[in-house]
């Protein structure tokens, strides 16, 4: 079912066998451009195939991607001064400044891009009542407004988005602090719990979301210390920390996200979640072509994760970015793919 989508997805870069698995300057490919310069951490330059590209175009002679670093203000300044024609992606902390630039246009699209506060099966998280309490203690809509200015959709703690074709709409999952406190007491924590969450400082919306959740958890007796780690350091330990806030990119099918993140023993199963009934239903869903039949199975999978799962999921992001109004043919893709062969720049 997911094979065509997997072939199109960003982790599956298909290389020419003659190049021994190395992607480098001059590598052979099927795209409209060839990589001619590659300075890691600085820039890439791609030169157009003219003529003869099978997909139409390209209209530009070359594309240049520039790494402006982690400072959000640097990208805003570069776009405002027309040092660059557009941004690959924009962060919520840049939004106000970018909207004030008169010569740029905003593009956005709803996606299955998210981040989850996930736990591993160590105390106190090994008791599902604690995990349930963490979910009931938050108001996802408030966090969406604080962390992402309402650009997106509320999360429902099951990692299946309304943009997925097999999404099953469950009853709204609403905040209930009294229930969260009761669940903690039943789990042996009448005075609450003290834990630490690891997260990244960038993109800024992730830290904003964590800070908002921490304030809400506090009301239920869930006291959380925030350990902000540089992104490079976080990705070294993202599958090891007991409690972390991890970003997950858009996947076009819900079964793809669930298989990557929650199937027992999976290499990206950072929470180490293992539920035989969940695995059985997921395998069944992956083999069900009819979307309505698959949606019925997905409803059961979503319910399992809301009840037993290892995540608190506050938001689904809308992806947005800004381009100079001179840029023609640009469309924002949920996976942030850039169709360079469709682009042009008005002289």
Regions found by a protein language model. Name each.
Residues 47-52, 109-133, 137, 317-318:
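A bilobed periplasmic-binding-protein/Venus flytrap-type ligand-binding module shared by bacterial periplasmic
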Residues 129-132, 220-234, 259-325, 347:
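Extracytoplasmic/peripheral linker and loop segments enriched in polar/acidic and small residues
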Residues 136, 153-186, 201-206:
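Structural transition elements
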Residues 2-64, 177-178, 182, 346:
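Gly/Pro-rich hinge or "lid" segments in bacterial periplasmic/extracellular proteins
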Residues 40, 164, 181, 185-250, ...:
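Ligand/substrate-recognition segments at binding pockets and active sites
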């Amino acid at each position: 079912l997911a094979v065509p989508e997997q072939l199109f997805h960003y982790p599956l870069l298909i290389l020419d066998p003659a190049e021994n698995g190395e992607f480098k300057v001059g590598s052979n490919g099927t795209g409209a451009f060839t990589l001619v310069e590659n300075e890691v951490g600085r820039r890439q330059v791609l030169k157009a195939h003219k003529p003869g590209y099978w997909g139409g175009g390209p209209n530009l002679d070359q594309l240049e991607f520039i790494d402006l670093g982690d400072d959000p203000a640097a990208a805003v300044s570069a776009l405002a001064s027309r040092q660059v024609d557009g941004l690959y992606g924009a962060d919520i902390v840049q939004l106000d400044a970018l909207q004030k630039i008169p010569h740029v246009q905003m593009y956005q699209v709803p996606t299955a891009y998210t981040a989850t506060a996930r736990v591993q099966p160590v105390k106190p998280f090994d008791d599902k009542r604690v995990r349930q309490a963490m979910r009931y203690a938050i108001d996802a809509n408030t966090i969406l407004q604080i962390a992402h200015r309402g650009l997106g959709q509320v999360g429902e703690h099951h990692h299946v988005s309304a943009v997925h074709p097999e999404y099953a709409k469950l009853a709204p999952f609403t905040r209930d602090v009294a229930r969260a406190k009761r669940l903690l007491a039943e789990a042996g924590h009448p005075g609450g719990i003290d834990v630490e969450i690891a997260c990244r400082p960038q993109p800024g919306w992730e830290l904003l979301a964590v800070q908002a959740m921490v304030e809400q958890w506090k009301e239920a007796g869930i006291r959380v210390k925030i350990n902000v780690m540089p992104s490079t350091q976080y990705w070294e330990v993202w599958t090891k920390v007991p409690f972390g806030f991890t970003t997950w990119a858009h996947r076009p099918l819900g079964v793809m996200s669930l298989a990557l993140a929650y199937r027992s023993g999976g290499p990206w199963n950072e929470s180490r979640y293992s539920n035989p009934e969940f695995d059985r239903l997921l395998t069944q869903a992956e083999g069900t072509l009819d979307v309505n039949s698959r949606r019925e199975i997905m409803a059961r999978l979503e319910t399992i994760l809301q009840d037993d799962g290892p995540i608190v999921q506050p938001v689904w992001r809308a992806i947005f970015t800004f381009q100079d109004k001179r840029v023609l043919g640009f469309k924002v893709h949920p996976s942030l793919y850039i169709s360079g062969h469709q682009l042009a720049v008005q002289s």
